[in-house]
């Protein structure tokens, strides 16, 4: 009977070898790196429809780097953002530089609105005056002042006329008439109220400011011109 029990015990141990290889409770089992890779391959074979998002999660869980395709897409995205920012900066910057490098005429207009006369102009009362040195016909003088964003010299009152007469002995003013039978008018089409020493000569249809007053002259004569514009305060 004792022999049978001994034989039975040996057979039981032989059939259940795990009991002979029990590990202490304090040690934890771990899966090697090779086993993890095998697990991943088996997972991919079993689930071929896994998308990139699922694969990324697996990589993140294991502390591995993302696939190179994802890194390439991120780099291309950053490059696109930088290029777009550069293009937008250029679009905004170019008009700004063109505005700063605008023509002197634009500078003259700004000076008028800022309440200051441009350089080489003089200020009297509430107006700016350009004292020209070139001799031109009446029509040429009118065009020259227009190019300076101003008008050919005009006279508002007697005091201004006396002041201007001291600056130049003779200069065109923005007053004319169609013929000796027509009244004197300004370039704005308004009737001119100041007296002009007239002549019966049919060709003297433009007005000139002299030291002694206003006088009619031939419009084709070459005379010094002055320009004027109002200050906007």
From Swiss-Prot:
Residues 1-12 have a biased composition (Polar residues). InterPro entries: C-type_lectin-like, C-type_lectin-like/link_sf, CTDL_fold, NKG2/CD94_NK_receptors, NKR-like_CTLD. Keywords: Adaptive immunity, Cell membrane, Disulfide bond, Glycoprotein, Immunity, Innate immunity, Lectin, Membrane, Receptor, Signal-anchor, Transmembrane, Transmembrane helix. It comes from the Eukaryota. Glycans are attached at residues 100, 178. It is a single-pass type II membrane protein. GO terms for biological process: adaptive immune response; innate immune response; positive regulation of natural killer cell degranulation; positive regulation of natural killer cell mediated cytotoxicity; stimulatory C-type lectin receptor signaling pathway. The keyword Acetylation does not apply. The keyword Disulfide bond applies. One of its GO terms (cellular component) is external side of plasma membrane. Disulfide bonds join 117-128, 145-227, 206-219. Its main location: membrane. Residues 116-229 form the C-type lectin domain. Natural killer cells. It holds the Pfam family Lectin_C. SMART domains: CLECT (SM00034). Residues 1-70 are cytoplasmic. Coiled coil: none annotated. It is found in: Cell membrane. Residues 94-233 are extracellular. GO terms for molecular function: activating MHC class Ib receptor activity; carbohydrate binding; transmembrane signaling receptor activity. The chain crosses the membrane at residues 71-93. Residues 1-32 are annotated as: Disordered. Heterodimer with KLRD1; disulfide-linked. KLRD1-KLRC2 receptor complex interacts with TYROBP homodimer; this interaction is necessary for the expression on the cell surface. Immune activating receptor involved in self-nonself discrimination. In complex with KLRD1 on cytotoxic lymphocyte subsets, recognizes non-classical major histocompatibility MHC-E loaded with signal sequence-derived peptides from non-classical MHC-G molecules, likely playing a role in the generation and effector functions of adaptive natural killer (NK) cells and in maternal-fetal tolerance during pregnancy. Regulates the effector functions of terminally differentiated cytotoxic lymphocyte subsets, and in particular may play a role in adaptive NK cell response to viral infection. This is NKG2-C type II integral membrane protein.
């Amino acid at each position: 009977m004792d022999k049978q029990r001994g034989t039975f015990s040996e057979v039981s141990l032989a059939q259940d070898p795990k009991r002979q290889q029990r590990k202490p409770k304090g040690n934890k089992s771990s899966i090697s790196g090779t086993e993890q890779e095998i697990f991943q391959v088996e997972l991919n074979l079993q689930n071929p429809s896994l998308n990139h998002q699922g694969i990324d999660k697996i990589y993140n869980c294991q502390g591995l780097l993302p696939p190179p395709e994802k890194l390439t897409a991120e780099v291309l995205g950053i490059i696109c953002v930088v290029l777009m920012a550069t293009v937008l900066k250029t679009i905004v910057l170019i008009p700004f530089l063109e505005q700063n490098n605008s023509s002197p005429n634009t500078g003259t207009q700004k000076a008028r609105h800022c309440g200051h006369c441009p350089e080489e102009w003089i200020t009297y009362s509430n107006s700016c005056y350009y004292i020209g040195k070139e001799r031109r016909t009446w029509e040429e003088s009118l065009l020259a002042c227009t190019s300076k964003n101003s008008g050919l010299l005009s006279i508002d009152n007697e005091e201004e006329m006396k002041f201007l007469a001291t600056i130049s002995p003779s200069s065109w003013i923005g007053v004319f008439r169609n013929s000796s039978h027509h009244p004197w008018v300004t370039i704005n089409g308004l009737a001119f109220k100041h007296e002009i020493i007239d002549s019966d000569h049919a060709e003297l249809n433009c007005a000139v400011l002299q030291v002694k007053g206003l006088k009619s002259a031939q419009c084709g004569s070459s005379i010094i011109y002055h320009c004027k514009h109002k200050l906007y305060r």
